[in-house]
């Protein structure tokens, strides 16, 4: 699984060298942010059902036409699949917070997602809206500390940009 630490080690090994001072600074920064990332992961895990529901609701509020006949959410089964996808990505974001890198999202979420969604006639903009809502709804310190919020929002932004 890709993280800052595994990326630094892999790059140094591929070049047949020890990690540079710059490499080690990158690792140190990652380690220093670990506490905030773990706080964000804990808060997300403790409230993920509400986060997923609110994000999914925001998606269908913004793109109400998706519930029309012939659209991606024209049955309860399809609507449930949308919420399932949002849940899946939120779990991957949680894993990224724990790992300290984008590996989980890259490996289990992003690779090929846009192509799959296009094939299934699922507009990625609706997922982007769901994750943007989750990001914009975040309130520090109500939900988590400011630094934890920065870490959480960064992974939401990563998913938003990847699906855009």
UniProtKB/Swiss-Prot annotation:
(2R,3E)-phycoerythrobilin 1 binds at residue 82. It is found in: Plastid, Chloroplast thylakoid membrane. Keywords: Antenna complex, Bile pigment, Chloroplast, Chromophore, Electron transport, Membrane, Photosynthesis, Phycobilisome, Plastid, Thylakoid, Transport. It holds the Pfam family Phycobilisome. GO terms for cellular component: chloroplast thylakoid membrane; phycobilisome. (2R,3E)-phycoerythrobilin 2 binds at residue 139. Signal peptide: none annotated. SUPFAM superfamilies: Globin-like. GO terms for biological process: photosynthesis. Contains two covalently linked bilin chromophores. Its main location: plastid. It comes from the Eukaryota. The keyword Mitochondrion does not apply. It is a peripheral membrane protein. InterPro entries: Globin-like_sf (IPR009050), Phycobilisome_asu/bsu (IPR012128), Phycobilisome_asu/bsu_sf (IPR038719). Heteromer of 6 alpha, 6 beta and one gamma chain. Light-harvesting photosynthetic bile pigment-protein from the phycobiliprotein complex. Belongs to the phycobiliprotein family. This is B-phycoerythrin alpha chain. It comes from Rhodella violacea (Red alga). The lineage of its organism: Eukaryota, Rhodophyta, Rhodellophyceae, Rhodellales, Rhodellaceae.
